Regions:
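Acidic/polar loop-and-plug regions of large Gram-negative outer-membrane beta-barrel proteins
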Residues: 156-246, 270-302
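Face-selective signature of the C-terminal outer-membrane beta-barrel domain
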Residues: 238-355
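Structural signature of outer-membrane beta-barrel domains
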Residues: 24, 36, 84, 99-101, ...
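Short acidic/polar hinge/loop motifs at secondary-structure boundaries
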Residues: 35-63, 82, 179-181, 185-189
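Extracytoplasmic beta-strand/coil segments of soluble accessory domains associated
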Residues: 1-35, 51, 57
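Transmembrane beta-barrel wall of Gram-negative outer-membrane proteins
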Residues: 98-129, 134-173, 182-201, 243-253
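A beta-strand signature from Gram-negative outer-membrane beta-barrel systems
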Residues: 51-95, 105
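Hydrophobic, lipid-facing positions within transmembrane beta-strands of outer-membrane proteins
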Residues: 15, 77, 90-92, 104-108, ...
Length: 355
């Protein structure tokens, strides 16, 4: 069995996949034999591959313990996606769809067909957007896919590039039963400038609200959430670009070679409003407000990262009436950096350290 979930509740944006109860860190995912799993966390961030399915011709799922072509063990399963082959004739497609919560997708695909009996080129552009089922859980995704190839009777060489850009509002806190009892199933506490305490009976006993330059003040409970304030730029932003060079060659009817080179870059950040954080956690000293020493404060932080992942894989196979044998290998390298900034601290009078 396979289960998918999404933070926004509409199947768009940050999504997860489980196979037989196993999470994505134990599921190996490849595209044309190239590893797709994040090299650092070993999960797959599907949000960085918007509408990739529109360029996939075949998808194979192997459940349970096994191995995949990237060499790492998979306890939950393996998924291999094969992208589309070249088209013999030129074509152009425009597809659009619309659904609940202002969810829509637009896709444009064009291809040259076979040129001079050996060359072919294809391009896809996609846009996906949704307001989300969860409050304020909007999603904006853009993606591209392009491939060019040379083909003859025994050899094919294909260069593929694809990538995506995502901007998603945070919706990963989820609502507790007490919160849903007061504010409904679609309540989203991310980006909230509010402290609250909810009694077991399921109503608000006290809420304190704060805003830029303001003071915390007790306010009347509003079950519709109209008195809540939110940090508007609490978003996740990421751009990923992938490059694959694939070579297939048939030496004889029995011997065949498959090889590939790959390179992936990623760059992104997210910002969030944090309430009552210790200043020492961010390398800042306490400060005084009206004669009182302040060691905790509300702040806005920005967490960023950039990374690259590259390598190569190969396999040689031999097949006859009695034997199927293959030998392969791969070599990969990953380099990533995490860094951050404090963008704003409530009532802070000193100089903010940029890092």
């Amino acid at each position: 069995s396979a289960i998918t979930t999404s933070d926004a509740g509409a199947g768009i944006g940050y999504t997860t996949l489980r196979i037989r109860g196993t999470d994505g860190t134990r599921i190996n995912v490849t595209a044309n034999g190239i590893p797709i799993n994040d090299a650092e966390s070993h999960t797959v961030f599907w949000v960085n591959l918007p509408d990739f399915a529109s360029s996939v011709k075949d998808l194979q799922v192997q459940r349970g313990a096994g191995t995949s072509t990237n060499g790492a063990g998979a306890f939950g399963g393996s998924i291999n996606m094969q992208t589309g082959d070249f088209s013999l004739k030129p074509y152009a497609e425009i597809n659009a769809s619309y659904g609940s919560f202002n969810t829509h997708k637009e896709t444009v695909k064009v291809g040259t067909g076979l040129i001079n009996e050996h060359w072919s080129f294809d391009v896809r552009l996609s846009n996906i957007s949704s307001d989300g089922y969860i409050d304020r859980a909007s999603v904006g995704l853009n993606s591209y896919y392009a491939q060019g190839g040379y083909y003859n009777d025994n050899t094919s060489v294909k260069l593929i590039t694809f990538g995506g850009k995502e901007r998603t509002y945070h919706a990963w806190n989820y609502a507790s039963k007490d919160q849903m009892a007061v504010f409904g199933r679609r309540f989203n506490s991310c980006r909230i400038h509010v402290y609250w305490r909810i009694k077991a009976e399921g109503y608000i006993n006290r809420r304190l609200i704060t805003d830029y330059g303001g003071q915390k003040k007790p306010i009347k409970a509003d079950q519709n959430g109209g008195t809540f304030h939110f940090y508007d730029d609490q978003t996740d932003n990421y751009v990923q670009k992938n490059y694959h060079l694939l070579v297939n060659h048939t030496f004889t009817p029995q011997w065949r070679l498959n090889a590939g080179l790959h390179y992936t870059t990623g760059d992104g950040y997210y910002q969030e409003y944090k309430i009552g954080r210790k200043l020492v956690e961010y390398g800042m000293k306490p400060y005084e407000v009206s004669g009182e020493n302040v060691t905790k404060s509300d702040l806005v932080r920005k967490k960023a990262m950039d990374n690259w992942f590259g390598g190569g894989i190969f396999s040689v196979s031999y097949t006859n009436d009695r034997l199927n044998a293959s030998l392969g290998g791969g070599l990969n390298r990953y380099d990533g950096d995490h860094f951050g900034k404090v963008l704003w601290v409530k009532n802070y009078l000193g100089q903010l350290n940029p890092d």
